[in-house]
Amino acid sequence: MLLPRRCPRGDSSAMCVLAFAWQAHPRWPLVVAGNRDELHDRPTAPLARWEEADHLIAGRDLQSGGTWLGVSERGRFAVVTNLRGFGAPEPQRVSRGALVTTLLADEQPLAAIDESEFGRFNPFNLIVADREAAWFLSNGSGPV
């Protein structure tokens, strides 16, 4: 699956892209490739185990404290992409990076995700997967 998204600066030559293969090969249950081509001047930390949440391995958005992509020790993977075209982002909303950190810390089954909370975030696409299931979630409207 490939999820291209225009970056906020409106440059059509730059896209945020994610490609992943889930349960496509017995040796590698999940393969992920992507780029975070959102705001090059936004401070980030590279992929690492988080000290305060040592079950989490992810990059870190140093501005909001969340992450755009990560994996937990239990094998849960999550990635969020911004969804553009619904007006300017509202800065008072909860950071979309909190979705990923919350879902990676959660031990409930993926089927129990509470989508009623999604309205607190600016528009997003979210992919969450573990060994048993993979989910695509979004709070945007229209085709993906």
Model segments located where?
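N-terminal nucleophile
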Residues: L2-L3, G10-V144
